[in-house]
Amino acid sequence: EMQRSLVGSEMCIRDRGMCSFQELRIPGVLQRLALCYFFTVIICTNIHEKYIPALITVLLLIYQIILVTGNGFVYGPQNIIAVIDQYILGASHLYNDHGIDPEGILSTIPSISHTLIGYCIGKICIEKENIHSKLEKLFLIGTVLLFAGYLFSYGCPINKKIWSPTYVFMTCGAGILLLSLLIWIIDIRKYQKGFKLFTVYGVNPLFCYTAGELLFIALIHISIGGNTLHTWYYQHVLAHYFGDNCFSSLLMALSIAVVIGIIGYTLYSCLLY
């Protein structure tokens, strides 16, 4: 488990290898995933699963107190999240958006809770009880989390940048409800056509994510006609036919996803997971 966590961090560092160390952003998505995986493994192998929901609550409560007492909802460098990150890592190693890095040190606390919720849901999914009973549990938990996030948002904004507790509730709740819907469609109703795409991305998620990052980096560093390949494709293809708007930006992202999907499908067909 520790090896997997280290591999995740190493892949992201290699992904940004073209930057000098003085400008290298130390936090990142893969580093966040690695840390969450690492601490979740430690917790779940040393604490009985019946105590994990209580631990999730405690972690989110502690983080909420830190946010309330440390200007945690201020969108600026005086935010406690920014203060800690800049003190430990330095401003040059952070994602510079008003001094707040969305994958910083302090916001890893609620991210661990996020991962622990996923662990608990996974345990329910692999239980041997009737699938309808499991579906009822998932639907109930998802609904409670979604409504809790909405109700608590009046005192704690739903904000990804600071990974607020309400953001954890809302995203987990929505994700669990979507999972419930897919279980009902695929496993209960036995409607499985058209869902292979989920399998293609699901069996190699880390590869697909990293490949997408590398493809994007290549697009913004390869030049064609005086522009980067990314700019050329957007201006001469997407914006030319669909206009310079949000829909074209969506098509740009989908184009990258399609390319990665083709590669992922090739790996899936060759049973390379």
State each model region's role.
Residues 1-8, 13, 273:
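Single conserved hydrophobic/aromatic residue that forms the stacking wall/gate
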